[in-house]
Amino acid sequence: MLKITQIRSSIGCIPKHKATLRGLGLRRIGNTVSKIDTPSVRGMINLVLYMIQVKRQD
């Protein structure tokens, strides 16, 4: 499991990156979600890595 937290605002970013944040379930700064570690989730994380913080959750 991965614990993903949004640490930067999506204002002014590329619309595709905003959609990726929505796809991950993130809506605002400080919001945290838990996701299963899959290749598709990893790809989404790599796209918006500059706006999120990722920690491994056991």
UniProtKB/Swiss-Prot annotation:
GO terms for biological process: translation. This is Large ribosomal subunit protein uL30. GO terms for molecular function: structural constituent of ribosome. GO terms for cellular component: cytosolic large ribosomal subunit. Belongs to the universal ribosomal protein uL30 family. InterPro entries: Ribo_uL30_ferredoxin-like_sf (IPR036919), Ribosomal_uL30_bac-type (IPR005996), Ribosomal_uL30_CS (IPR018038), Ribosomal_uL30_ferredoxin-like (IPR016082). It holds the Pfam family Ribosomal_L30. Part of the 50S ribosomal subunit. It comes from the Bacteria. Coiled coil: none annotated. The gene is rpmD. Keywords: Ribonucleoprotein, Ribosomal protein.
